[in-house]
Amino acid sequence: MESAEAQQEGPKHGMHPSFLNTIRQKERVKERLKGIRQKIGVYSAKGGVGKTTVAVNLAYTLARMGYSVGLLDADIDCPNVPMFLGTDAKMDISHFPLKPLDVRGVKVASTAMVVDDAKKPIIWRGALVAKMLGDFFENTDWGELDYLIIDLPPGTSDSPLSIMQLLDLKGFVLVTTPQRIAAVNSIRSGLMAKRLGVAVLGVVENMSAGEPTASTKDVAAATGTEIIGTIMMDKRLGEMADSGRVPALEDDKAYNEFKRIAERIK
């Protein structure tokens, strides 16, 4: 329910109360995150293209390069970052603001770290998910960081929209795969970001066979950016991720692939 103050001030400022509340929340989020130098989203409208793989390895690559890094799992419905890191540790929710967990040198926060059973589905309507995201941003204390890498949910509806509206992002890394259907959805993602005034920093082709495909080149062209990296299809790296090991920490080839991406978005 809108506060009496918001209801009174809405007409005075010529704004709907809900819009006024969004502006106020954005100001509170900005204040909370003021110690973070760069906030970068990893995004695609298509699920299953490897957003979390890219987000996790990019975060740990930046940490390995000597930067202070946070990793935010912003996928409320399917928060997979803790599984990729092989941790079931929980954040302390008895005190606010919440403190991210240090997982191998990177500060990590995820809704999977605040619910009793992360394996149970979260069945919420879009508006409630958007509110949860706003509350999560507003009530998590990251401290001072060089980079916050944000693993976005797929789609172009409430969740990614809320993130684009509430966070002052440097921009997005778009993730796609060689398949045409992934490219079509990645283009949707990039155009949505640009329409909302958020930069597209570059395109990454995951599960690549080597040279970027024509479909991936189409994504870069349609969004006015460049292909900044290709991640090779490698069964061994997939097995590492399944066992909670971060390839960028343990495999020099993987690290160098992600380092090339990191150098392009710094």
Residue ranges and their predicted role:
Residues 1-27, 190-266:
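C-terminal lobe/tail of nucleotide-utilizing enzymes
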Residues 31-37:
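Phosphate-binding P-loop
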Residues 36, 47, 73, 81, ...:
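Residue-level signature of catalytic and energy-coupling elements of molecular machines
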Residues 38-75, 190, 203:
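Walker A/P-loop phosphate-binding motif and the immediately C-terminal alpha-helix
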Residues 68-123, 130, 217:
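Phosphate-binding loop that captures ATP/GTP phosphates
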Residues 76-78, 114-116, 154-155, 178-182, ...:
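Conserved nucleotide-binding/hydrolysis micro-motifs of P-loop NTPases
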Residues 115-166:
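Phosphate-binding/switch loop-helix module in NTP-utilizing enzymes
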Residues 143-147, 156, 168-189:
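Conserved Switch II/interswitch segment of TRAFAC-class P-loop GTPases
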